[in-house]
Amino acid sequence: MKEIIESFFRERSLVNHQLASYDDCIPSGDNSLSRMEKIVRSIRVGTDEEVEDEKGGLIKLDVIDQDIIIRVKNIQLGEPTIREADGSDHPSQPMECRLRKLTYMSPVRMDFTIFKNGVPTQPEKGVQVGNMPIMVRSRRCNLHANHIAGDRVLHPTTSDEDRKMWEELLRQKGEDPLDPGGYFIINGTERVLISMEDLAPNRVTVEINKRYAKKTEVAKIFSQRDGMRKPLTVEKRRDGMLMVKISTAGTTAIPVVLLMRALGIENDQELFQAIAGPTETFKFIVANINEVKDNEEYTVDSMDEAHGWLEKKFAAGQQKEYREARVNQLLDRELLPHLGDQVEDRKKKAIFLGRIVRQVLEMAITSRKPNDKDHYANKRVRLAGDLVEDLFRVSMGQLARDLKYQLERHHNRKRELKITSCLRPDVLTSKIMHALATGNWVGGRSGVSQLLDRTTYLSALSHMRRVTSPLVRSQPHFEARDLHPTQWGRLCPNETPEGQNCGLVKNAAQMIDISEAVPEEEIRTRLDEMDVFQPDDWTDGDRIHVNGDIYGVHKRGKNLVTQFKNARRRGAIRSEVSIRYDNVNKDIFINTDKGRILRPVLILYDGAPRLTQKHLEMVGSGELTFKDLVNEGVVEWIDAEEEEDLYIAPRPFVLPEAVPEGNEYAGRPVSHSSITWLNLGEPSATEANLQAKITLPNGTKTDAVFNVPLLYTSEHTHCEIDPQLVLGVCASLIPYPEHNSTPRVTGGTAMVKQSLGLPCLLYTSPSPRDKRQSRMPSSA
């Protein structure tokens, strides 16, 4: 399958996931509604009122005599430039920034419009608000194939002529054509953003808390929407009461039944059905309903009474209007915001809350096991684009508040309001630059930005493919450090440091991709075409969850999953969208969010791969690309959650060391590099018909044809492209790692990065990088 692997790396570099994440974050010609643009349009300073995002961000001034608001939108990222001492600007190149100890960055511009009493003034377009560091080889970089040749756009992945021209232009600019990019240049030093593991948002995890020898069943969810994260906890106390804790409500616990009544479920039977699971859970549900009705502390039996109880708890002593507004804010914005923030979304939240409670009760009666927190379906990887997005959100908020303050000062002094005279670009620039230069990120994290390890080419590659865990290094965390089955093919099982970082600092496997967010509207539209509907009774049918949000139900869930996968294999649905059917709870989970580690596998249909020998020949000649194989339904990207439903063969067959007995040229050695699979893709085949190139004792080369049994059956759904792809870039260079003990291979991955080669041929070139070479190379 080497043709498929070579095709994959012709399309993507080894740091493609970092580049793609950063490109998705920044604005560009084909990404006008980027993450940075969404942040700008969501700005609300001086007001809490909901406005349309299409009109841009909103800054409202606190002045008495007039109603003044500022609208901001249309963020643009210019060409990377250097400003000289005389004030002139000229395009910058990464090598120039390295030599002159400068930062490789671009100007950030936006459009502002001031409204006075609802009347707009002349818009100020293209106002520079600061500078943004640019990732080397990203879409905005001057070395990118779209910009390096002037007006001509090069296509180095599909055209040999363009590739040679691109490499020559890189050499002229002092760059190494083999350098993959994926890092920043800050004050002349190369810095890389380390990918970080994080808990997946909008997913319910059930666990048992042990305090003072007491066990409590607890369910947790981090509900996230537009960068806003609201944790929610449901726990079953020792007396059987089911209580909810909302992070923004402090330590106050709310009975689940009371909260569900406040959300609109007033009928006891409907409330019971929303929670009911196995028969053993019925007594707990009835007891909670009666407790909320009869206990003097609550005495709640209707939605109005539930609202009244919440008003007393969270806005006691305030006016009626304020109390109602506080409860509405709690129910709409602070409770499970990923399900919506409108009044009509409350019923859906009540149903979702009932599902969480059911899982807690099922664990209480031991019919459900605690969730595996180390399962990679419950984790997401935050890449450079996600980290820059967090940093830009905080920096932009700080800039907007500073602009509001400066405009109010100008207005109070009776000066003309001009954005260019009030805005201070250094506010945004200094905030971003400080974080990238020191590694101290927003949220209190440190070590996010690190100096790129340039000891060798391999050490730099490994550094940019590193994935770190946020767990404290001084604690044991035995389970978190262990290899997990869901890391197969996603994270290298061998490449990890020795010592306290062991198992917490990992490296990506060779052939992976990390998902970017796919708009949910695309999937919802497709589901509507597949007869998914929104019922009045959410307990009827198989529920469909899109990124944790209950979207609708379907009468035949398994048929929907099959239909959805077929559409994805035809290219009608994006390849990074995953789907899984939960047989136990009759739920369908669809994930379109970012940060899921995906790996490619071959699709099997009725016990035969869709890949044929013709496909391999066309891929080898360049007629087909790896992307074409995905769009034709030959190869499929899968994440850890969807893999739970699959049956994957580790290899199609076991190749003998020599031609088997009973065949011509028996006993002659064979290898994978000389094998042609003649009946590849043939339906109902039980043996693989192989043709091997062999060498006879007299030196003559010929072909030997023989059969070996296939390892996959009609029950298998997929097959690995190559088992060796489970290793990372360092472990894959160790000869025969399967014949060594694991600790030795782990030590070998560290030594591989220390092997010095020839750094460059032109030693007189003014390179700012540390040059390391062996003064006494081994003669062996």
List each language-model region with its residue ranges:
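Conserved N-terminal architectural modules of multi-subunit, DNA-dependent RNA polymerase core subunits
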Residues: M1-C502, K506-S765, R769
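Positively charged, low-complexity/disordered segments
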Residues: P766-D770, S774-A780
